[in-house]
Amino acid sequence: MKTKNIMIVISILFNVVLFTYIYWRESHLKEMYSNLSFGLQGDLVQLESTIEYQNNNKWNDENVVLEKIEDVREGIHQLMVTGINVGMITKSQENDLWTLYRYFANFPTYTGFPNTKLENNDINKLIRLRDDLRSAGWGTNLGYSSDWASFSMKIEDLTN
């Protein structure tokens, strides 16, 4: 009887530790995923301010804008892959990210070489992108949130 009681106590303690670990791990994954979303929105704000800076300085270093667009694409990909791998992304969120990814596929790609010259048409598209980012809520001195509902609304505003 005494051995049975000891086994029950050990089993209860083990289960408490296991549930605590699972809860902590789930909380940690949610926080990490939220930080990725917040980081992507930070990249969008930096892209807006980089376009503004280049526009004010006669596009003297347009590769910086292309690098920022690449950062946004990588952020979208990282958020999507991480969300799928840890099972934290809903189908609606995945669709939002695909919409955003397709939207940014329409802009020039960073080649890795610092001598890329943008055509006037590309510059005009980027200026329009800056305006669209600001109107969606991603811009310098504009606040943004890490909750997905706000993020999703901004994606819809940007892509429509």
Give residue spans per PLM region.
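N-terminal Sec-pathway targeting helices
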Residues: 1-15, 19
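Ser/Thr-centered flexible coil motifs
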Residues: 33, 90, 116-119
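Transmembrane signal-anchor/signal-peptide helices with a preference for the extracytoplasmic
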Residues: 15-39
